[in-house]
Amino acid sequence: AAFGYMPQTKNNSAGGATFGGVLRAPMKYVGAKTYNINGQDNTSSTGNPNAEWNSNTGEFIKNPDSDTEFGNSGVINYLNKFGRTGTTQGLYKYYDPLGELYYETLRYLQGLPPTSAAISGVTTALKDGFPVYTTWNDPYGGGRTPSSDYSCLKSNIVVIGDVNIDSSGSSRYPSTSATNNVPDRTGWLNTVNTLEKRASSNYLDA
């Protein structure tokens, strides 16, 4: 899967900045084969319909997920085409709210929906020439619910960026809800800030 920012024209302190990040390409198998939730090969006789490269030629496929709005899609394409999908070529994202992007990614891996702030007011211009998925399917499948235990599922998040990120106001995160796997982000943020200052802090790691 690939998450990314939408174009920002304001930083968070100025108000009115676009919240966090959005899903640009859903979780899937990008190669010739697919597998079920138990890791068993379940590739159809015609191959993986969402494969991102041609297994015969090795060429990348421009629109592997059959997007009808931009005719451009896929995990690899999103990574390869940073700043080159919108109307202005070479326009890269800035005022990056990395914490919010990371939080949205965690919600996706937990089987939760996107926050309303992340997907409200999404215009064609904000999509920047690439799909934005405002409804999500649980990437792990298996009939899990948002309150299910995801602790044993192995996940990895790779962040591509620079040091010039825009700190996010903690008030923009959803309210804590232990039953729905929404942790106390503000509390943990304060704990990390305290520890990074090499100060003492009491916290419960539950």
Where does each model-flagged region fall?
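P/S/T/G-enriched low-complexity
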Residues: 1-206
